[in-house]
Amino acid sequence: MNPSEVQQFVRETALKQHNWMRECIKLIASENITSIPVREACATDFMHRYAEGLPNNRLYQGCEYIDDIENLCIELSEDIFKAEHANVQPTSGVVANLAVFFAEAKPGDKLMAMDVPNGGHISHWKVSAAGIRGLRASAHPFDAEEMNIDVDKMVKQILEEKPRLVLFGGSLFPFPHPVKDAVDAANEVGATIAYDGAHVLGLIAGGQFQDPLREGAEYMMGSTHKTLFGTQGGVVLTEKKNAKKIDDKIFPGVVSNHHLHHKAGLAIALAETKEFGEAYAKQVVKNAKALGQALYERGCNVLCEHKGFTESHQVILDIEKSECIEFSARELATMFEEANIILNKNLLPWDDVSNSDNPSGIRLGSQECTRLGMKESEMDEIAEFMKRIAIDGEDIKKVKEDIVEFAKSYSEIHYAFEGGDAFKYLKFY
């Protein structure tokens, strides 16, 4: 491609993305959509600048206004999560995890975390952040029927293995984890409890999940762009006694510049969360439960029917055990994409971790649909679209036509001071 053509190619490709997303039902559990003011804040001069160090104590000059922004992000984060100390400089949830691993453990120390098929994130294991720090990870004992940690076995394992870190949270996360139940055992062996809240920070902010910092976690970390509808980035929340230790491990430890334009957008998203977060989080959970029920009634094997399917934004389908479905999870994910339903295949507890490209499950998330104004009745419509493809074997092109018309009706941002067109392309020239 001629260099002079790249600019137009990128614009045209971005427009295609915007227009495609307008016509899709988006059920990826790790994504969300920001308000127009958040996007405007990201497209500012802050994207060009550096600000190494903490606010009001930078190594660079020219940081007066980013200090104002970052201080506001810190203030809002501490307020929303009732935390004594917040650091918003991690550039992702994985970087936030890595900072805590560096702050609280040394190479060779043991970490207890969720196994990946049970819902743990790759950053909790040797292949990612835990391995970078040289930690030896062992898996929480897991009850697959309950889709949660086995409390009695967990306590016994903490006492026997004496880990340096006990980590909760994950990426397959339908129910709160037993943080309180680990406290006594962790204290006895000198372990620190940390909580990876990347997927559920927005629900925690809205008071609709659990409250890890009050339940015994010394650290809560996560990304700021899943159920928390902010810009891509990370945050670490902890007690005041840990402030210097974690700040030093973030910078100069694992972050240099921290993408200042994203902090400008994050400040607005946090303000939206403070104002609208409770109503939003309540509807996210209602929608997830409704989607699980609607799919279950149509013949899908939705995990944990006996527990109301979920208490978070996530709904988990076991495709292999759905007798009325003849396709694999991998095949279905592709078929749904062809029909403009965007979701992901996912490992389940009985899958081998090496089989991640052909697992038995599908993971759904209700958070982005909720931000676009959908409620329980729309979850029923989505379940019917999915049934028409997965169970009825209806022509995908025909179902797609109906999905496009449905999706176009939900393209306004809700739970914001200024909503606007969710898929508007911000054009500067």
Swiss-Prot record:
What reaction does this enzyme carry out catalytically?
Answer: 5,10-methylenetetrahydromethanopterin + glycine + H2O = 5,6,7,8-tetrahydromethanopterin + L-serine
Q: Which SUPFAM superfamilies match?
A: PLP-dependent transferases
Positions bearing N6-(pyridoxal phosphate)lysine: K226
Question: Where is the protein localized?
Answer: Cytoplasm
InterPro entries membership:
PyrdxlP-dep_Trfase, PyrdxlP-dep_Trfase_major, PyrdxlP-dep_Trfase_small, Ser_HO-MeTrfase, Ser_HO-MeTrfase-like, SHMT-like_dom
GO molecular function of the protein, one example? glycine hydroxymethyltransferase activity
Q: Domain of life, per the record?
A: Archaea
A family per Pfam:
SHMT
Q: In which pathway does it act?
A: Amino-acid biosynthesis; glycine biosynthesis; glycine from L-serine: step 1/1
What function is annotated for this protein? Catalyzes the reversible interconversion of serine and glycine with tetrahydromethanopterin (H4MPT) serving as the one-carbon carrier. Also exhibits a pteridine-independent aldolase activity toward beta-hydroxyamino acids, producing glycine and aldehydes, via a retro-aldol mechanism.
Specify the protein name. Answer: Serine hydroxymethyltransferase
